[in-house]
């Protein structure tokens, strides 16, 4: 038998930053959150961040593109940074 556990997450981001990211990289944040559903994604701590604990996630989105996502955990929400 194969089982999988799903965790519900809430995502947030700054709309202006999201628009700039889409113009620069061609990926909108609504698609980028698909990285969090990749079973093989990797997450490491962003050691360059001094203001808050940030993380770098590397994984594939639903279109099979490898994406790098910078994010922070704020309470119950995942805040996309870049």
Briefly describe each language-model feature range.
Residues 1-82:
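Ribonuclease/tRNase effector modules and their secretory precursors
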């Amino acid at each position: 038998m194969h089982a999988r556990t799903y965790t519900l997450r809430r995502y947030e981001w700054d709309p202006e930053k999201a628009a700039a990211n889409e113009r620069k990289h061609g990926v909108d944040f609504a698609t980028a959150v698909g990285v969090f559903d990749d079973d093989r994604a990797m997450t490491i701590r962003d050691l360059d961040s001094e203001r808050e604990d940030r993380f770098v996630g590397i994984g594939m989105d639903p279109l099979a593109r490898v994406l790098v996502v910078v994010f922070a955990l704020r309470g119950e929400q995942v805040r996309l940074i870049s």
